[in-house]
């Protein structure tokens, strides 16, 4: 019996070729676009965000060319609750979030899977550069890096559950981006040469602080820049304007370069220091998801990424509680930022990950 699949179609070249490859493999496919956010800025020239009206039309065009049914699922409320609210709350509490991880976690691989099941489909498929396999010994599904190291997206997929992995396919996992564009051109897809989306869809101009102030109705109060000893160095514009490791835009004159090293929410102070003050020997993460196992029974040695484009770093990871891991780096790491994801790897296999906690908060978890 022909297996059915819903293809998550963003209107970009990757998801379009994913749809083509699924049809070529013999799946009974339908395309689906999640309507997440309406922002007039997203349609402006120069912005490279997803979820624009033209993206929907591009997806519809490709689906028609492949002879597939095509759906648009409005999910504005779910997106607002699961992604934007969390994004704003994390910034207001001193962190720097990655909303694309939450969009994948709660919408693309959760809400869309629910829709697929309602339509009688066994699988969803996406244009992410990642691979998924089943361990023959344990029966668990594992997540692996895409073979193209320049496009691998496994970092933003670490939160996928066993159920989601069991019902998700990644047709592009063994391809390079160059090969994908070549296939799209061969098939005459309207979006074959379309640039990749890079901006956050609901903040296409990159001005996170203004968006959060407008979205929440809360202004970020100015306060003091201080050094490690508490000496006042100047005035900041509001904490949401700054992230750990930031050097530019501080407006502080000093003999040596200063960086944002921390924030004190209680006193509304932003702490500045030198490069050496950005280094961390360990961090703690919560909201964890482990893929090959349910729990770490003993410390493990692995590689860790604390930012999307960061090279993996050797570390030891141990589980301290049901929802708490401690990561100890072999070498101190620069600008380990609360709110970002720390993702664990063993070779090309994703072991899991979680959200980096502010210093001093782990003991309260």
For every predicted segment, state its role.
Residues 125-132, 136-365:
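AMP-forming adenylation/ATP pyrophosphatase catalytic core
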């Amino acid at each position: 019996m022909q297996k059915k699949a819903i293809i998550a179609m963003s209107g970009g070249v990757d998801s379009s070729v994913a749809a083509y490859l699924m049809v070529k493999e013999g799946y009974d496919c339908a395309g689906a676009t999640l309507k997440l956010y309406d922002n007039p800025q997203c349609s402006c020239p120069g912005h490279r965000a997803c979820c624009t009206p033209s993206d929907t039309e591009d997806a519809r065009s490709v689906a028609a060319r492949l002879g597939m049914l095509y759906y648009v699922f409005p999910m504005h409320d779910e997106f607002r609750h699961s992604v934007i609210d969390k994004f704003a709350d994390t910034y207001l509490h001193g962190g720097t979030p990655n909303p694309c991880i939450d969009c994948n976690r709660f919408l693309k691989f959760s809400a869309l899977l629910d829709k697929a099941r309602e339509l009688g489909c066994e699988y969803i498929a996406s244009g992410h550069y990642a691979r998924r396999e089943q361990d023959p010994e344990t029966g668990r599904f594992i997540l692996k890096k895409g073979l193209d190291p320049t496009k691998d997206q496994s970092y933003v997929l670490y939160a996928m559950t066993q159920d989601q992995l069991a019902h998700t396919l990644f047709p592009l996992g063994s391809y390079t981006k160059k090969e994908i564009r070549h296939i799209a051109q061969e098939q005459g897809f309207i979006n074959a040469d379309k640039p990749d989306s890079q901006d956050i869809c609901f903040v296409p101009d990159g001005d996170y602080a203004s968006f959060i102030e407008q979205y929440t109705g809360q202004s970020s109060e100015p306060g003091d820049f201080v050094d490690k000893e508490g000496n006042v160095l100047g005035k900041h514009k509001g904490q949401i304007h700054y992230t750990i490791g930031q050097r530019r835009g501080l407006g502080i004159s000093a003999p040596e370069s200063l960086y944002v090293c921390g924030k004190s929410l209680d006193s509304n102070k932003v702490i500045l220091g030198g490069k050496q003050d950005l280094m961390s020997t360990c961090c703690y993460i919560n909201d964890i998801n482990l893929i090959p196992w349910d729990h770490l029974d003993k410390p493990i040695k692995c590689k860790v990424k604390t930012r999307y484009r960061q090279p993996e770093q050797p570390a030891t990871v141990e589980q301290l509680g049901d929802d708490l891991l401690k990561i100890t780096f072999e070498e101190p790491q620069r600008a380990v930022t609360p709110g970002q994801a720390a993702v664990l790897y063993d070779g090309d296999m994703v072991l899991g990950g979680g959200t980096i906690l502010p210093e001093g908060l782990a003991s309260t978890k």
